[in-house]
Curated annotation (Swiss-Prot):
PANTHER family: POLYGALACTURONASE 1 BETA-LIKE PROTEIN 2 (PTHR31458:SF2). This is Polygalacturonase 1 beta-like protein 2. FXXY repeats lie at residues 121-124, 129-132, 143-146, 157-160, 171-174, 185-188, 199-202, 213-216, 227-230, 241-244, 255-258, 269-272, 283-286, 297-300, 311-314, 325-328, 339-342, 353-356, 367-370, 376-379, 386-389. SMART domains: BURP. It comes from Arabidopsis thaliana. The keyword Glycoprotein applies. Glycans are attached at residues 128, 145, 280, 352, 364, 392, 463. Expressed in flowers and stems. Residues 199-219 are annotated as: Disordered. InterPro entries: BURP_dom, PG-associated_BURP.
Amino acid sequence: MNNIEATLFLCFFCIFSSSNVHFAGAKQTAGNITPSENPFTPKASLIRYWNNHINGDSPKPSFFLSKASPLTAVDSTRFASLASNHALNTHHSDFCSAAKLFCFPELAAHSLEKHGDDVNFAAYSGKNFTNYGSDRLSGADSFKNYSGGDNIAVDSFRRYSRNSAGHDDGFTNYAGEVNVADQSFTTYATGTTGGSGEFTNYNTDANEPNGRFTSYSDKANGRSQTFTTYSENGNTGYQSFTSYSKNGNGAPNEFSGYGTGSNVVNTGFTKYGESANGANDSFTSYGENGNVPVNEFKGYGDGGNGAVYGFKNYRDQSNIGVDSFSSYAKNSNNEKVNFVNYGKSFNLGSDNFTGYGQDNVGGNVSFKTYGQGQSFKVYTKDGVVFARYSNNVSSNGKTVNKWVEEGKFFREAMLKEGTLMQMPDIKDKMPKRTFLPRNIVKNLPFSSSTIGEIWRVFGAGENSSMAGIISSAVSECERPASHGETKRCVGSAEDMIDFATSVLGRGVVVRTTENVVGSKKKVVIGKVNGINGGDVTRAVSCHQSLYPYLLYYCHSVPRVRVYETDLLDPKSLEKINHGVAICHIDTSAWSPSHGAFLALGSGPGQIEVCHWIFENDMTWNIID
């Protein structure tokens, strides 16, 4: 035992020898500490906190205790001291590793070494590509099954194919089915002549796909870029294109099947095609069948000459969605922009065209069969044609709810023994993390006013994916509570206990669905038990937020019914899972565009809506 450990042990011994604390007993199943377990670990501290703040009759569930920090007592004290002195960033890698946090892996430093030969990467991941294909004459580089299926895929491409001639790049099945993707393309194909870049099945079926294309194909001459099935079926995430094809000459770009079937994926195009000559860009089936796709075009095609931009089936058949076109094709010469089947959403979206085609000389803009909800401000009055404006958008029928997974929402009447129903995907898609000890959390910044400090602590560079993830979580936590809602974001198990007991009292129990068996399959409802006698009751529901450490968004739900039920295999009728479902009785404050109403029909306040508690989410209730 070194001097630090000895000092800590004596300090802890003095504190606890004078307090009424018992460390004897059985293993975690009994909610006590084993004789061999250090009584000063974060987990041991959590068990004592539970004993002191929750009535003794309430069971200590293993799934909750398992989320305690794995830090040793010494490390917990050391990192707490660093946090209180604003020096935790100096031990970022050590902290991430010891506390089992979600941190992006550190890529090898950028190298100035040139790679002049053709490369063929298959089943490869975690690479920093610098100067690949630079100054190349012809040849091709191929990336197949790159970063596929990874939990966290972080790749950086810098100066790739820069100043090359006739050089082709192909990305096939790139970062598909990953959990969190962070892909960076900086000065990619800048100053190239000819050649092509092709992205096929890029970030397909990814959770939280994030990509940044900066100065991509800047000053390129005749180089084509194709994005096919890009971020298809992706979940959340942000894709940014900055100065893409800027100052290019005759460089066609094609987006086909971009973001199709995705859920809340944001895309930003800034200075895309600015001052380009003879650009030819087409967006086909862009954001089609998506749920709330958000796209921003800022300074797109500004100052261009002779460009042709085509949008076909753009955001067609999607749910809601938000598009913003600012200074699009402004100050351009002879540019043509065609929108066909634009924004025919099932639920009214929001589209703003500001400074659209303004001062465009000799060009024309046409809208054919475009949806309701568009706003056109300061656009050129000459050369803009509007045809077949459509406002017969309907939110009825199966076509509307195809993006809402079957079984995600259901009616209370389904919770009857013998009912055959579809189970949604209840698997936790987020990276595995743990809570931080409270003595560390209380010393960490967590507000929009200190966002820069948070980025520094967790090594998140400005405009990086991690910076966006952190900002999004903080913003959601600071969002004002809905009418009748009490909410709090918690980063320690003790904080969650405090919030739950402040709403429900000390006699509480916490539940979650037992496992993920039956997920995405048909199941039969077995024995059903209504919590609190099946009466309308109160609950505190806690849902994970993506953040470096385990962060939960907890909120009070005042009028619900909560059920436990056995889930049976449809063929053998054997028990395969024990599910927890919550039914919201009062939905009057919900948005009319909520996925529950698209899936079930009806609207706010007209029906109750039920859903399962997914893996690693939980609900707190008053103990029976």
